[in-house]
Every structure is written in structure tokens, then in C-alpha cells.
């Protein structure tokens, strides 16, 4: 029987964990997206031309009560369609990471569900007690982006 937690099981196949670091309050999971190509969000053409890399820091759901961040080594791709307005774009992992987000989708979904059951300020207080860093105003913006009803 294994006595360690295998974090890879909690992440999509396209994401590979390269390193895990931690301190008393936070866990940092360094990951890389292992896709060979990416689809342009504007025209839908798949591209294999990697333009560059950059690091993103995204908040994920807490692990064992600690604030958890994904440090994503992401690729920027060049669109192969000459008639497309987009020259470069970043890779997404559908249903998990969005190019514009500072949180994983599951973290956003949890916060939205909590906000719809309580209130934005109340859910922000609950999130802070769980070591999820957010505010009532951020939750309102998140609900608007997801086009969920505000109560």
C-alpha cells in the first residue's frame, strides 16, 4: 500500500507535474502542458508552431488546508492561418485552464456554487477560511464572466 498522495491523478492527462514545493501556508505545483498542438481560438485551425513559453501562476483548490498554486509552464503558439487576425495565442486545457484566468476552472466553479448558495461577501469569507484567496468583488466579476444569475 502506498503512503503518499499521487497528485497527478487529480489533474488532466495533458498536464504533467514536474515539481512540488511547499512552505507552512502554501503548496506550489509546477506543471507543464504536454500537448503537441493547439487550436486557434479565433479561426479554429490547429497549430504546431510554438512561438515561446511563459510561466503562469493559477490558484487551485486547497490541499490539506493550504493555499495551492499551479505554476504552469505554458506555450504560446503561432496561428498557421494567414487570413486570421490572431498572430499568437496561448494553450488551454479545456475544462481546466483558460488563457485569461487566474484560477483553475474547478476552483472557479466551487466559488460560484458557494456564492449562489450564500452571498458573494459570505462566500468570500468562507473561501478565506479555507485558504482560497478571493474577495466579494472578485466573485461578482467571476459570476458575470460565467453569466450566472446574481441573487
What are these model-predicted stretches?
Residues 58-151:
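Short, positively charged, Gly/Tyr-enriched micro-motifs
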Residues 1-92:
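Short, conserved DNA-binding cores of transcription-related domains
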Amino acid at each position: 500500500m502506498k503512503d503518499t498522495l499521487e497528485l497527478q491523478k487529480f489533474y488532466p492527462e495533458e498536464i504533467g507535474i514536474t515539481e512540488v514545493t511547499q512552505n507552512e501556508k502554501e503548496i506550489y505545483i509546477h506543471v507543464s502542458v504536454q500537448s503537441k498542438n493547439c487550436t486557434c481560438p479565433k479561426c479554429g485551425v490547429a497549430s504546431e508552431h510554438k512561438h515561446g513559453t511563459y510561466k503562469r501562476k493559477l490558484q487551485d483548490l486547497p490541499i490539506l488546508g493550504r493555499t495551492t498554486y499551479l505554476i504552469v509552464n505554458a506555450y504560446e503558439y503561432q496561428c498557421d492561418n494567414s487570413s486570421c487576425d490572431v498572430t499568437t495565442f496561448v494553450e488551454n486545457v479545456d475544462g481546466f485552464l483558460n488563457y485569461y484566468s487566474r484560477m483553475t476552472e474547478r476552483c472557479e466553479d466551487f466559488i460560484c456554487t458557494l456564492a449562489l448558495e450564500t452571498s458573494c461577501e459570505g462566500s468570500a469569507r468562507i473561501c478565506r477560511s479555507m485558504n482560497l484567496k478571493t474577495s466579494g468583488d472578485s466573485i461578482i466579476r467571476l459570476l458575470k464572466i460565467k453569466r450566472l444569475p446574481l441573487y
